[in-house]
From Swiss-Prot:
Organism: Methanosphaera stadtmanae (strain ATCC 43021 / DSM 3091 / JCM 11832 / MCB-3)
Assigned protein family: Belongs to the archaeosine tRNA-ribosyltransferase family.
Cofactor descriptive note: Binds 1 zinc ion per subunit.
Keyword Transferase among record annotations: yes
Organism taxonomic ancestry: Archaea, Methanobacteriati, Methanobacteriota, Methanomada group, Methanobacteria
Protein's gene: tgtA
PUA domain sequence ranges: 596-671
Name of protein: tRNA-guanine(15) transglycosylase
Superkingdom of this protein's organism: Archaea
Binding-site residues for Zn(2+), renumbered to this chain: 275, 277, 280
Function: Exchanges the guanine residue with 7-cyano-7-deazaguanine (preQ0) at position 15 in the dihydrouridine loop (D-loop) of archaeal tRNAs.
EC number: 2.4.2.48
Active site: 90
Length: 674
């Protein structure tokens, strides 16, 4: 028996999406990837030339056709369909769902797929239609699970798909995913969702996918079966789907339909060709209409594949740039029912956040109230609790240009005129000279001045004309945050913008604070926000006189922090994160209780970690569940001895599941650790 195991590695992350690579006997596939459906006896398009790294064909059709079967057994499926790269084969489950029965067993179809030398084979699952009775779904599920187990035992020279079923019962989807994961398949398709997409039930599709994801491992690719329209690719990718298969490109073409990233166009309605692909550049609408139907269908199918592959490429780039959710929101606004799907996805904020990177290359653009559910917003509100009040008074100012510390003092403090009532308060107090100062803004609500250069609080934009949902959201944040203070003073613009009540106009002269923050206090706020309450004091000791701060000559931002000429931390220029140095790592390790911020490595990995070598996933024994990609982490052994420190390349959940690839990019000790 040849033990073939999928080798999958994540390269880039955004939301739950992954740009990754997995190896097969016939090549490496970059995900997300589209698998065009290739009919074993009818294919006319060169899908490899159009961009296909991987295709899917039906082993049952080959099995039932004696001529195709003979050639496949003698020459292999790659020769049969003339495709040299990775091939996945379906098992006949689709025919089973259509005709109710097929004349091949689960074991036979696995053995046949091995015999024709496919790269990825599929067990004979039971596709359960949406909205069936629960008893039927449960019975089908048990058969699917049993067949997944049988396939894992039977297969040898084959990468194996195990399909998640469960109809429209979310708990059954999760149960199936957990059960089939026990048998360590190589890829996990999510099946029987085509009817949901055909009925535009995208909210139910999101439930089916997200509950499936809860039970699936992070270290294997996931395939959304039958998802062939480019308008759904971005949403599905954001949920963690890596592979898609499409017969839609030819099915739509046969009906003179042009697929686009935001919908479908009918040839009969067009006066201009819709894109800049070869077909649309070389042919006019009238020429296509006058053409033989078969030739026309082939050309439209080529257009459809071009659009589909272009969308996959755009999604990959959006993941690399940290802009996937902006693209998802754009795509989902192309159809009301897709927007239903996005709004249902908002209910899975915790699932999304645990896999979302802490920092990204691109700014956060607020495009509608759905943006409020993006992982960055709830994470900020959670981390905001790490910063405790320093005074009993709070002053809330409107947003200005960024960074706020450069402009709010000039705009709202120095321009204050006692004769013109400008502020509202919850008390009669007029002395706010000693106050915490924050800015109220969409989408993050409350931004302390010390965090105004930290990602994503410094890197975000929202429209100047605000929607009611965001106003209500920010108002609730302001009201809850204000409860921490005895006296709260709010600028009139904030009161009016967010319709805040229960605050009275102050007509007496006020003593206002200077809306600035010292570099030392900024460092403490960032440390508390990034690592946990009290981390600032642990790192910097509470004595400002002992700390030396070096700034960039060009930007005037903090770059390096020292105590007695020994580097504690550095500040990353692009996102404001604190990067630990030797002394900072030691102090943070001493302060934080186990397992906070820690990655525990095996004994074999200890000497390499001490030398500053990267930590690989297979050597990680445990890690703090709150670790996210791009976080600064401490590397320790099982006895909690500090070995090294560095940047996480994956979230804790991914680190625990993966046995290949890097987990931590380790920073080298400047001095040998004691």
């Amino acid at each position: 028996m040849v033990d073939i195991i999928v080798d999958f590695e994540i390269k880039y992350k955004d939301a739950m999406a992954r740009v990754g690579k997995f190896k097969t006997p016939h090549g490496t596939v970059t995900t997300p990837a589209l698998m065009p459906v290739v009919h074993p006896g009818k294919q006319t398009l060169d899908v490899k030339k159009l961009g296909a790294q991987i295709v899917i064909t039906n082993s049952y059709i080959i099995y039932k056709n004696e001529e195709l079967k003979k050639k496949a057994l003698e020459e292999g499926v790659h020769s049969l369909i003339d495709f040299p790269n990775t091939i996945e084969t379906d098992s006949g489950s689709f025919q089973l769902s259509v005709y109710g029965d097929i004349d091949i067993t689960n074991e036979e179809v696995i053995k046949f797929q091995e015999a024709i030398k496919t790269d990825i084979g599929t067990s004979l699952d039971i596709p359960t239609a949406p909205y069936v009775k629960r008893e039927e779904a449960e019975n089908d599920l048990e058969i699917t699970i049993e067949r997944a187990k049988e396939a894992a035992n039977v297969k040898s020279d084959l990468l194996l798909n195990s399909v998640v079923q469960g109809s429209t019962f979310p708990d059954l989807r999760e149960k199936c995913a957990k059960e089939i994961s026990k048998y360590d398949a190589d890829i996990y398709p999510i099946g029987a969702v085509v009817p949901l997409m055909e009925m535009y039930r995208y909210a139910d599709l999101v439930d089916a996918v997200m509950y499936s994801m809860r039970g699936l491992p992070e270290n294997k690719p996931r395939h959304l079966m039958g998802a062939g329209h480019p308008m759904v690719f971005a949403l599905a990718t954001a949920m963690g789907c890596d592979l898609f298969d499409s017969a839609a490109y030819i099915l739509y073409a046969n009906k003179d339909r042009f697929m686009m990233p935001d919908g479908t166009l009918r040839l009969e309605d067009l006066i201009e060709m819709p894109c800049s692909c070869r077909v649309c550049c070389e042919y006019t609408v009238d020429e296509l209409k006058q053409m033989d139907q078969k030739k026309r269908a082939k050309l439209i199918a080529e257009h459809n594949l071009h659009i589909s592959f272009a969308e996959i490429r755009r999604i990959r780039q959006a993941i690399v740039d940290g802009e996937l959710m902006k693209l998802v929101e754009l795509r989902c606004r192309s159809h009301p029912f897709l927007l239903d799907g996005l709004r249902r996805l908002m209910e899975y904020k915790e699932d999304m956040e645990r896999l979302n990177p802490s920092s990204k290359k691109s700014a956060f653009f607020y495009t509608g109230y759905e943006s409020l559910a993006r992982s960055e917003v709830p994470k900020h509100l959670k981390q905001l609790e790490n910063i405790k009040p320093k005074n009993k008074n709070l002053v809330i100012l409107p947003h200005t240009r960024k960074p706020y510390t450069k402009y709010v003092n000039r705009e709202y403090i120095k321009k204050y005129t006692p004769k013109i009532p400008t502020y509202y308060s919850n008390t009669t107090n007029t002395d706010y000279s000693n106050s915490d100062v924050v800015v109220a803004d969409i989408p993050f609500g409350i931004i302390p001045l010390g965090l105004d250069e930290f990602y994503p609080l410094a890197q975000n934009e929202s429209p100047s004309i605000h929607d009611l949902d965001s106003k209500r959201f920010i108002r609730d944040i302001i009201n809850n945050y204000s409860k921490k203070y005895d006296n709260v003073l709010i600028h009139r613009k904030v009161i009016e913008k967010f319709d805040i009540t229960n605050f009275n106009l102050i007509e007496d002269e006020l003593q206002l604070p200077e809306a600035k923050i010292s570099d030392f206090n900024r460092l403490n706020d960032i440390a508390d926000y990034q690592f946990g309450c009290g981390a600032g004091n642990a790192l910097f000791g509470g004595d400002e006189d002992k700390i030396t701060i070096e700034k960039s000559r060009k930007t005037k931002k903090i770059r390096h922090v020292f105590e007695d000429n020994e580097n504690i931390v550095n500040m990353r220029a692009n996102d404001g994160f604190l990067i630990l140095s030797d002394l900072g790592a030691k102090r943070l390790h001493k302060f934080l209780e186990y397992p906070h911020n820690r990655v525990v490595v095996s004994e074999d990995s200890e000497p390499f970690a001490l030398k500053g070598k990267s930590v690989f996933n297979k050597f990680v024994l445990d890690c703090d569940e709150n670790i996210r990609r791009n976080d600064e982490v401490l590397i320790v052994n099982k006895d909690d001895k500090l070995l090294a420190f560095g940047k996480a390349l994956l979230s804790s959940y991914e680190i625990k599941d993966f046995n290949t690839g890097q987990a931590i990019k380790t920073r080298k000790w400047k001095k040998e650790i004691e």
